[in-house]
Amino acid sequence: FLETTPVQELTIPVILEGKDIIACAQTGTGKTAAYVLPVINELSKGLHPANAINAIIMAPTRELAQQIDQQIEGFTYFVPVSAVAVYGGTDGIAWEQQKRGMEMGADIVIATPGRLLSHIKLGTVDLSQVSFFVLDEADRMLDMGFYDDIMQVYKLLPATCQTIMFSATMPPKIRTLAQTILKNPEEVKIAISRPPETIMQTAYVCYDMQKLRILEDLFSKSRPQRVIIFSSSKMKVKELASTLKRMKFNVAAMHSDLEQSQREEVMKEFKNGRIDILVATDVVSRGID
C-alpha cells in the first residue's frame, strides 16, 4: 500500500486503541490489512505470551482463510509473529501440521469455524490467552449457518479479548450478533456491499431447461474468457461443466468434492488464463480475489 484506504484509515486507529469494532466494508477495500496490520503491530511488541495463541481470525471458507494467511505471511516477513491456517478438506498430514502449529502457540490462527471447533473438541487448541478475536465476512458465516459455532468459540475466549467484526452487509442478524459479542463497539461503514459500477448486469427470466441455450447464445456472440458460472449445488456444477466440455469449451469445475490441492490447481489455471470458464458452487464466491 502506498497510502491507506478509507476503511484502513478509519479502523486501524480504533483497533490500536483496544476498542471493539464492527466495520461494514466489501471485498476489495483493503479490509484484511485494516485488521491484520494493527493486530500484527500489537503482537510484535512482545507483550503477549510467546508460546500461546494470541489472535483468532475466523473466515467462512478455506479459500478466504488461505488468502488471509498469505497476506499475513507477507506482512510478517521481517516481524517475529507466526501464523497458521486451519481449515477442512485436507489430508491427515495437513491436520497434523495444523495441530502442531496451534499446540506450539502460533501467534495468529486463521480458521474456518467447523475445523477450529474440531480441534477444540479434541483438546488440541488453548484459547485462554487470546487477545484478539476477528470475524471476517461475518454475514457470510451467518448465511452458512455458523452462528452456533461462532458463539461456542466466543464463550471460550477471555473476557478481556478485543473483538473485531467485518461484514459486507449489515442485516438485522449481524446487528444481533454484534450486540451479543461486542462491548461498546465503534461502528465504521465503508462502501456497503454493492455491485461494481463497471459491471453490466442482465437478468434472464427462464426455466431450468432454457439456461444452457442462453449460455450457448452468449458464448456464440463473444468467445468466453475468464468466465465464472456459479451454481447452487455441486451436482449442478458437475453436470454443467461436463455439458460445456462436450460442447468443446475450455472449462473446469470447482466444488467441495475436490481435494484442496486440486482446487488450488484449478484456481491457478483459471487465473493464468489456461481455463476460460470456471463453474463453481456459490460457497466459493467469497474468497476469490
Give a label for each model feature.
Residues 1-289:
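Conserved helicase RecA-like core
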